[in-house]
Amino acid sequence: MIILENEANEPGFRIQQRAESETGKKGRFGGILKENPIKGFSSETLTRPLTGLFRKTGKSQRKTDDDDSQETIAAPPTNFPNMARISATIESVQINDEYAGYRDRNPETGSKLTLNEGAGVFGNAMHPLTRYFKVGDVDVSILGRSFPTEKTVDEEGPWTAQSLFNSLESRIKKERIDAKDQPSDSRSRNARETLISSKY
């Protein structure tokens, strides 16, 4: 601003227009928005700062259905340890999935192995309850879900806090009695505890 003192018709000051400098505007983003920006910066990075995180592949062809299915398979990052072994495993899984016999192993369709076939294959390894039933062509996977694999014993009464406390107390008493019956172990343990306490 320039202040004028002697002119009566004009106000006491006037605004002088500055010529635009070649360096551009001076401000926070002045250096970034120049015609020749700093290397690595552009006006696009200001509007979309996260685009550098997601790199595009070099493929610019149209995608087909096969490409879409291949891209849905997850792959570990390249800096992952044992990358070669993991990628080999992924490739082998992909190859095995394309195998024609995959449908037989698919859990949705089931193995379709019946008890008659399974008895010859597995022999005595079948569940012991299966010999008591004539099930014919029932799927083995269904039987595995319906029959328990362990013998279950029902408790005489319902569990309560008192019954749990009593059973725990009886176990502790039994362990103490067993410990008294084996004096050599308890003496060596007491000797070790005495030795450790005397050191520290």
UniProtKB/Swiss-Prot annotation:
Summary of the knockout phenotype: No visible phenotype, with no defects in cilium morphology. Double knockout with intraflagellar transport protein ift-139 results in defective cilium morphology and function.
UniProt keyword Acyltransferase, yes or no: no
GO biological-process terms attached to the record: cilium assembly; intraciliary retrograde transport
Tissue expression pattern: Expressed in ciliated sensory neurons.
Places the protein is found: Cell projection, Cilium
Region (Disordered): 56-76, 175-200
Compositionally biased intervals (Basic and acidic residues): 175-192
GO cellular component: cilium; intraciliary transport particle A
Keywords linked to the UniProt accession: Cell projection
Annotated family: Belongs to the IFT43 family.
Function comment: As a component of IFT complex A (IFT-A), a complex required for retrograde ciliary transport and entry into cilia of G protein-coupled receptors (GPCRs), it is involved in ciliogenesis. In particular, may act redundantly with the intraflagellar transport protein ift-139 to regulate the transport of specific ciliary cargo proteins such as che-3 which are related to motility.
Self-association and partners: Component of the IFT complex A (IFT-A) composed of at least che-11, daf-10, dyf-2, ift-139, ift-43 and ifta-1.
Protein name per the record: Intraflagellar transport protein 43 homolog
Species in which this protein is naturally found: Caenorhabditis elegans
